[in-house]
Amino acid sequence: MAGRTLYDKLWDDHVVSQRDDGSSLIYIDRHIVHEVTSPQAFEGLRIAGRKPWRTDSVIATPDHNVPTTFNERASGVDGIADPISKIQVKTLDDNCDELGIVEFKINDNRQGIVHVVGPETGGCLPGMTIVCGDSHTSTNGALGALSFGIGTSEVEHVLATQCLVAKKMKNMLIKVDGQLGQGVTAKDVVLAIIAKIGTAGGTGFAIEFGGDVFRAMSMEGRLTVCNMAIEAGARAGMVAVDEITLDYVKGRAFAPKGDHWAMAEARWRELHSDADAVFDEVVELDGAQIKPQVSWGTSPEMVLPVDGVIPDPAQESDGVKAAGVARALEYMGLTPGQKITDIAVDRVFIGSCTNSRIEDIRAAAKVVAGKTKAASVKEAIVVPGSGAVKAEAEAEGLDKIFTAANIEWREPGCSMCLAMNADRLGEGEHCASTSNRNFEGRQGYGGRTHLVSPAMAAAAAISGHFVDIRDWQS
């Protein structure tokens, strides 16, 4: 029998039946729900007279619309100023209460961003199929799981049947060997990958991340990388199970205990690609050559090393690409030949499902300790990804490091990653952001997003412009 990839194993374990059109019916182990893509799904169940098939497979929490300031959060749902946002959060509460679904509500200390809460509670585990009405559900693949985003109609299907019709994707291996240099993080690695293969490079593939760099990477780092597999065009990203995975999962609230843990661990240790597995495509990078990255344009593939200069569309031989570069430069207010380190920032956002875990908060705090936010920076905010992250950071005194630097410490939520709540950019403002998308208007109408690591964002908050974190740390 031919060797199988990690994705092959996860897929095969969950196929219920194969259909004549080449698609399969697959079983879903875990369903994560938030307030934005679930209301129509719950209403569809209600209209059809159906109930969720397995309420114990569902975990819900509001994240996109929740305010992140202490004053707003003190009033719970009533503190949400926007009426549409308030309705969405209240509707999630009502649906979960009615159907008996576990929900971490707005003032529950377990509330947070779905892609942070799932792994940290043990709600998402190795070997699972995991879905959520959110494209960044790929995050959970870092645990050795098959995890991907679905649409609202599919949310209803999974609630009703615990199954989903899907077509198997092709296999891609992205292998990064060598050792990362000082100041180079998981965020820089995934941005470098996207710069290399483009935002369509992973289309139709499930990506496995392998090689020396990922074997040495923390679970928080792996979660960051798999989170942005979708920005590389793939629906799912994943990393093989190893000791780092098992150490992370063990003891978490929903993780197996006692004899069940021993059985689960034995099974999970098989979740890796076989030595003779064949991938449809293999991409290789040298980790030692990756530098701290900064996005300059309006697509996650428009990324440069921090010591780079803004490209000139006149030097682009492909007319379509040249037009895209020109359009991006116009929107971003940048000029060809401008140094990345000469770009001034108006706001700084450290948070999102990409970079709001405790490792990210620690990295940012290390940079700003004993310093003060630049006067030219209008606002810098740090938004932990969950109540658990917030509590851990506060226990370590990290919140006080930020506030002493005139950087705001907030409540958990998606925040400035997307303009669906009160945290957003003004027109023309440049933001050093640890989020995952830099599309036009993503963080607010006319806002200009630069994707960076937490350390790079923190350094920009202090300096007022981008700096090479390697020099900062030397």
Curated annotation (Swiss-Prot):
UniProt-listed InterPro entries: 3-IsopropMal_deHydase_lsu (IPR004430), Acnase/IPM_dHydase_lsu_aba_1/3 (IPR015931), Acoase/IPM_deHydtase_lsu_aba (IPR001030), Aconitase_4Fe-4S_BS (IPR018136), Aconitase_4Fe-4S_dom (IPR036008), IPM_dehydratase_rel_enz (IPR050067), IPMI_cat (IPR033941)
Pfam families (UniProt xref): Aconitase (PF00330)
Catalytic activity: (2R,3S)-3-isopropylmalate = (2S)-2-isopropylmalate
Lipid biosynthesis keyword on record: no
GO molecular function ontology, one term from the record: metal ion binding
SUPFAM superfamilies in UniProt: Aconitase iron-sulfur domain
Cofactor(s) this protein cannot do without: [4Fe-4S] cluster
UniProt remark on cofactor binding: Binds 1 [4Fe-4S] cluster per subunit.
Record EC number: 4.2.1.33
CDD domains noted in UniProt: IPMI
GO BP terms, alphabetized: L-leucine biosynthetic process
Keyword list, A-Z: 4Fe-4S, Amino-acid biosynthesis, Branched-chain amino acid biosynthesis, Iron, Iron-sulfur, Leucine biosynthesis, Lyase, Metal-binding
Matches recorded under PANTHER family: 3-ISOPROPYLMALATE DEHYDRATASE, HOMOACONITASE, MITOCHONDRIAL-RELATED
Function: Catalyzes the isomerization between 2-isopropylmalate and 3-isopropylmalate, via the formation of 2-isopropylmaleate.
Family per record: Belongs to the aconitase/IPM isomerase family. LeuC type 1 subfamily.
HAMAP family registered for this protein in UniProt: LeuC_type1 (MF_01026)
Subunit architecture: Heterodimer of LeuC and LeuD.
Full protein name: 3-isopropylmalate dehydratase large subunit
Lineage: Bacteria, Pseudomonadati, Pseudomonadota, Gammaproteobacteria, Cellvibrionales
Gene field: leuC
